[in-house]
């Protein structure tokens, strides 16, 4: 985690100095999305036996329409053999951006997708809880059966049916043991 954090901090400082945090963040997000949707390209960029010149050529094609800073940054990662850590670097970079902009990431897990109205209500409630702007990342997980699980930083609020059933099971175990 130390090395990816250093790379993320370096890019963040560059974005801040050039007053291009939004543009660089958007380009970095696009790069990550492209790599996630094309696993073969990611493998090629990460595989140590592939020639660096070939990796840079692929990187140029992949990032041709992105900010120059991201294009150069990817080449530095290729030179330093750190492309396999891109996802972790990206997550850390986004954390730095959120901190700078006083935004909190809230991960919301529900058994079914939320509609716009439900999402807005949850966002308003979470904004009150975190005393600031929130960025919601939603996922669906049918195993929670019903309800909602919210993660804000290192705090988890489990209001799911699965969580309640697990809690009840633990209470019953304790009752059985002490009886």
Curated annotation (Swiss-Prot):
Keywords annotated in UniProt: ATP synthesis, Cell membrane, CF(1), Hydrogen ion transport, Ion transport, Membrane, Transport
Localisation: Cell membrane
Membrane topology: Peripheral membrane protein
Protein's name according to its UniProt entry: ATP synthase subunit delta
Molecular function GO terms recorded: proton-transporting ATP synthase activity, rotational mechanism
PROSITE patterns reported in the protein's UniProt record: ATPASE_DELTA (PS00389)
Assigned protein family: Belongs to the ATPase delta chain family.
One GO cellular component term noted in the UniProt record for this chain: plasma membrane
Oligomer and partners: F-type ATPases have 2 components, F(1) - the catalytic core - and F(0) - the membrane proton channel. F(1) has five subunits: alpha(3), beta(3), gamma(1), delta(1), epsilon(1). F(0) has three main subunits: a(1), b(2) and c(10-14). The alpha and beta chains form an alternating ring which encloses part of the gamma chain. F(1) is attached to F(0) by a central stalk formed by the gamma and epsilon chains, while a peripheral stalk is formed by the delta and b chains.
Location, primary (coarse class): membrane
InterPro entries: ATP_synth_OSCP/delta_N_sf, ATPase_OSCP/d_CS, ATPase_OSCP/dsu
Gene: atpH
Function recorded in the entry: F(1)F(0) ATP synthase produces ATP from ADP in the presence of a proton or sodium gradient. F-type ATPases consist of two structural domains, F(1) containing the extramembraneous catalytic core and F(0) containing the membrane proton channel, linked together by a central stalk and a peripheral stalk. During catalysis, ATP synthesis in the catalytic domain of F(1) is coupled via a rotary mechanism of the central stalk subunits to proton translocation.
